[in-house]
Amino acid sequence: FHFGDWLALDNPVQGAEQVMGATDEEFIANLYYAISAGIVAKAAGVLGYREEQEKYQKLSEEQFAVVQEEYYSATGRCCIKTQTALLLTLKYHLSKNEELTKRQLLKLFEQSNHKLKTGFVGTPLLNNVLTDNGMNDLAYELLLNEEFPGWLYEVKLGATTVWERWNSLLTDGTISGISMNSMNHYAYGSIQEWMFRHVAGINTMESHPGARTVQFAPTLNWDLRYAEAKYDSASGMYSIRWELSDKEHVTITMDVPFDCTAEAVLPMVAKSEKEAVAEVLGSEENGRYLLEPGHYEVSYQLSDWKEKTAVCVE
């Protein structure tokens, strides 16, 4: 992580060979030191190594405190004003004022005309953090953007793989003359995680290793209209599909493999439809339906469709 937010587009000194983003590399490196120590502590706990667990948990907490003291004001404002820094802040709950952080992040996106500027560190977090923090419409807007920089910009230029750089091909279709220019690079392909977890809505659950139980929790978007995904897990094939016939009705189909279960969290179910949905999926508990193995198809009317366009107030 000492390379920072590699290939981000927000460095004020831009040039054909610029590779470093504007997010402080020491902020990223120190933060991931804390995160890594926490992962080691968690693994040690699972394996029963209590002494090591306590050692690395203490290290993680101390390092998080160092990051917060160095890079955050007393009111919780992050002193690094980049998309990646604020995404990390929300992901790892570094600020005591997350509403302020969300407003800061939305302001940055307004200033960039709702275009991403993230690199190898920020992009894997980008859409997941936006959706998890009530900015799902912005996440979809970033996915569906056809201009540079964006995923569909690459598709429009004929890409069948994800590039290392957002501009590996120029707008006229010629290969950029920039050095270090891979045409098949995973980093920005990390958008697939968000597409599985939030668009289609298939989520593995840490409490159920081997995907013996998954969660179906799709998010709907009128600009996309439908989505479908399959997950060939160690326990069997899960699948889900949703399709909007109009802005008031959706049909969702779900398949749960033999000897497995799924937890379904359906979006925007109108109150008048809950009884009909329960006839297909069974009783609801805390907004969740427990599905046994089998095929399910449910159609229902949506609650009032409200575009959740956030208002930026500084």
Q: Where do the protein language model's features map onto the residues?
A:
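The feature captures the catalytic groove of carbohydrate-active enzymes
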Residues: F1-E61, A65-N128
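Non-catalytic C-terminal accessory modules of carbohydrate-active enzymes
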Residues: K58, D137-E314
